[in-house]
Amino acid sequence: MNTNPKSTLPPRADFARNLIAKASAPAKQMRSVAPPARGFTMKVSRILLAVAAVASCAFRAQAQQTTLRVGHFPNITHAQALVASQLSREGKGWFEQRLGPDVKIEWFVYNAGPSAMEAIAANSIDLAYVGPNPALNLYVKAEGEEVRIVSGAALGGAALVVQGDGRLSKPADFKGRAIATPQLGGTQDVAARAWLKKQGYRITQLSGEVMVLPTPNPDQLSLFIDNKLDGVWTVEPWVSRLEMEGKGKIFLEQKDVITTVLVASVKALGARRELVKKFVAAHLELTEWINKNPDEAKRMANAALKVITKKAMPPELIDHAWPRLTFTTELPKGGLEAAVAEAQSVGFLRGKIDLSRLVTSP
């Protein structure tokens, strides 16, 4: 998976430049010799012209091609990205077919939202599938100048999973316990802190009466299995893995909250708005296709996860996780406002937040 794309000169263009440079270099002082036969000279000239023509075509093709860089996570909550990236690998690119032959899609994988939003701000990617809270954080931090939500993607699929031995059976049991989340400031991190605060616990970003530990999803699973975590607030497929591999049980499930949105950078919207518009339309079609073809969508999502994580998920695990999600491009009324309120309650956002520019239709 790409992490730092850069343009490279087409091999044919390199060859042409070297050949033309050699042909154009000043001749060395030599003894007088008979000139080459006219036929030989014409043959070399034809070769040079042909190579130059090939190089010119390569340069034009490269100059005309537009690349859209799209970020996502290795989570089932990002099923549209998993399915589309797998179709790209299989030579059946969903977005490529709908955006045209002059558009290339490059996929980039992140562990959680804050990292993806750093990439948006750095102009390293153009669009991303991400949770609402990291998008909100960047929107507020940049005073609305960096990111826009252009579509919904998924609801649900997030939960608090606790050890199955009964140590956490009610909110009062959480004092002094350790709960992991995917990344500081991410959607599940904010949800965990906000919920714990509502239960009366003192929670800070670095300490508190309950330890909230930002930890990458793969590490969460191994630490949970080793009994070094009391609970994990995360998303599918990790919720199901914690249940099935870690023998955990769901304490609290978020069934209807916004889990994933599709965002675009303000820079991409300014420079290539029509292309972003086509991408969003294709995303809508893909969401509908996933809902109509769940078995094929699950197969492709699992194939993509195998490429990214180097390990395929058991089909029964995917089957267990899938029904917990609703794939939709709609944003439920009040969903973003609720996310803002949670982030404000735990200090990630402060003051009055103007959301009037956050959501846009390209």
What are the residue ranges of the model-derived segments?
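Pocket-lining segment of extracytoplasmic ligand-binding domains
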Residues: 142, 166, 201, 206-209, ...
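Stable alpha-helical elements in mature extracytoplasmic
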Residues: 77, 91, 116, 131-134, ...
